[in-house]
Structure formats: structure tokens, C-alpha cells
From Swiss-Prot:
The keyword Phosphoprotein applies. It comes from the Eukaryota. This is Matrix Gla protein. Coiled coil: none annotated. Its main location: secreted.
Length: 30
């Protein structure tokens, strides 16, 4: 199920991006 694996990778990538944005701009977390 390569397609399913890719979807999971996308979710993890977006999660890391959001985490990085939160670290850079914590005020956006409010």
C-alpha cells in the first residue's frame, strides 16, 4: 500500500511543518 504510506508521510510532514511554525511564532498558537 504505497499510496497509504505516502499519505502518512504527508501527515507527518505537515505535522513537523506546523510544529516548526509554532516554535518560530508561538503567538500563532493562540
Amino acid at each position: 500500500d504505497s499510496s497509504e504510506s505516502n499519505e502518512i508521510d504527508d501527515v507527518l510532514f505537515l505535522g513537523r511543518r506546523d510544529a516548526n511554525s509554532f516554535m518560530k511564532y508561538p503567538q500563532l498558537g493562540n
